Amino acid sequence: MRKRRRSAPFDVTYVPVATDGSLDQTLTITNNTETSVLPTLRFRPFNMYGMELPHVTTVGVNGSHLGRALLPAGGSLVDVLRFDGQGADQVRHVQVELAEVEEIDHPSPVLPCRSVMIDLEQKATADSDQFWGVGLVNPNPFGVTMRVSLVRLEDEPSHRDDPRQVESVVTLTDDVDLASESNDVIWLPEDVRGLFHEVVHHLFPPTYV
């Protein structure tokens, strides 16, 4: 009788160049267990020829390299990787090591929470000049805490197959507590309009009950 193959506790997917209009250089880690965790990841970047780039520093915009982002049971955590140092523009592959895992008591989301850029009419926008606020949605039957960051990207690359890299990140000072099945809007100061191109978020150990 053939033994049933057990799935790995975590799956990792790295996408250097997105084909769906989303951010480049994204990492998705999926939790196949029944326990929510705070993973700490380590990264080794490589170029398109498979050569390691030892002078490149790799961090996650959502803090996955620091063990700050919550990976819920049965759910996924998406992080955007930022590369700095000599050869940063050459990264096309990343080897990921799970350095540490801290278990945490947190329910598994039924549906993913969302964060979007919005204009003055509270409609979703991809135009940084119309980026007046952040719309947040929690469709789940329990409260969550979200940590939100604004992302500024480098200029569009000259070659279509090259990734558009993260240039700078600003994480909002206060985390946002969202009640079950609720939404919220965070209005931004006028002087940041036009400076950022994307908004990202991750779940954080809950402060909301």
Protein language model regions, located:
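Hydrophobic beta-strand positions in extracellular immunoglobulin-like domains
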Residues: 29, 45, 83, 136, ...
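Short, hydrophobic/aromatic beta-strand segments
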Residues: 36-42, 54-57, 144-150, 159-162
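Terminal connector regions
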Residues: 2, 72, 78-131, 189-209
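N-terminal "mature head" segments of proteins
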Residues: 1-25
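Short, solvent-exposed loop/turn segments enriched in Ser/Thr/Gly
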Residues: 19-26, 38, 124-133
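Solvent-exposed strand-loop boundary residues in beta-sheet-rich modules
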Residues: 47-51, 102, 154-156
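Intrinsically disordered, low-complexity Pro/Gly/Ser/Thr-rich segments with frequent PxxP/GP/PP motifs
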Residues: 51-89, 161-196
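Asparagine-centered strand-capping/turn motif at beta-strand->loop junctions
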Residues: 28-35, 47, 134-142
